[in-house]
Amino acid sequence: MSNLQAIIEAAFEKRAEITPKTVDAETRAAIEEVIEGLDSGKYRVAEKIAGEWVTHQWLKKAVLLSFRINDNQIIDGAETKYYDKVALKFADYTEERFTEEGFRVVPSATVRKGAYISKNCVLMPSYVNIGAYVGEGTMVDTWATVGSCAQIGKNVHLSGGVGIGGVLEPLQANPTIIGDNCFIGARSEVVEGVIVEDGCVISMGVFIGQSTKIYDRETGEIHYGRVPAGSVVVSGSLPSKCGKYSLYCAVIVKKVDAKTLGKVGINELLRSIEE
């Protein structure tokens, strides 16, 4: 355990006692160092190690502690003022820094300090919360929200109104993860630490949490909390055991490999689904 991690872990155990007035200098410095590291991409709340996603709980704890050490303050915006504990990521950005970091931010897009945005990303009017990681070449479309500590892969499209759940409210054990080269359709929600593996296509209006049945119609298998790589998913329902009613589920209607995904348009994949 590093010294930085040890400080965070110790502070978290006595978090109820920590306020902006009582926090000691060492703890404040450690928390701020973590937030800066998350902001720059040096740290990630979750990362793939040996093919498996690993959550660094101490980094998540630092994010939670950051709310304990700061008072609300006035934050100036173009159209109005805000009053919050967390600064905005781009508050001190210059044109040179935007150019150097290489992403686009459309007016009214909001990103909190402590979120990382990779090169070639485009942020339409959307919201990215503290601790989140947005991978290279990803589009966060209009009114999409990326929750606290959520991990978004490379070349992902989060369509209009998509919601990717965070870990802070309500408190979750692990962040929601969207793998590389995924398409999440308009108004879909992926929450509660669900993992969408690489190369998935989620149709519009699909809602997936930890308790959602993810039914593979080819194999009959039911998954929870994980969408297997290369899945094309639509909303559906499954009959109850008594046969008197049906309950919502997500349905894997087909699997595609990276080569097919690269050659075939998203709309074609979704429109070619047989009933």
Swiss-Prot record:
CDD domains: LbH_THP_succinylT (cd03350). Substrate binds at residues 104, 141. GO terms for biological process: diaminopimelate biosynthetic process; lysine biosynthetic process; lysine biosynthetic process via diaminopimelate. It catalyses: (S)-2,3,4,5-tetrahydrodipicolinate + succinyl-CoA + H2O = (S)-2-succinylamino-6-oxoheptanedioate + CoA. Coiled coil: none annotated. It is found in: Cytoplasm. Keywords: Acyltransferase, Amino-acid biosynthesis, Cytoplasm, Diaminopimelate biosynthesis, Lysine biosynthesis, Repeat, Transferase. Gene3D superfamilies: Hexapeptide repeat proteins (2.160.10.10), Tetrahydrodipicolinate-N-succinyltransferase, N-terminal domain (1.10.166.10). GO terms for molecular function: 2,3,4,5-tetrahydropyridine-2,6-dicarboxylate N-succinyltransferase activity; nucleotidyltransferase activity. The keyword Repeat applies. GO terms for cellular component: cytoplasm. It holds the Pfam family THDPS_N_2. Pathway: Amino-acid biosynthesis; L-lysine biosynthesis via DAP pathway; LL-2,6-diaminopimelate from (S)-tetrahydrodipicolinate (succinylase route): step 1/3. Belongs to the transferase hexapeptide repeat family. PANTHER family: 2,3,4,5-TETRAHYDROPYRIDINE-2,6-DICARBOXYLATE N-SUCCINYLTRANSFERASE, MOLYBDENUM COFACTOR GUANYLYLTRANSFERASE. Homotrimer. This is 2,3,4,5-tetrahydropyridine-2,6-dicarboxylate N-succinyltransferase. It comes from Haemophilus influenzae (strain ATCC 51907 / DSM 11121 / KW20 / Rd). The gene is dapD.
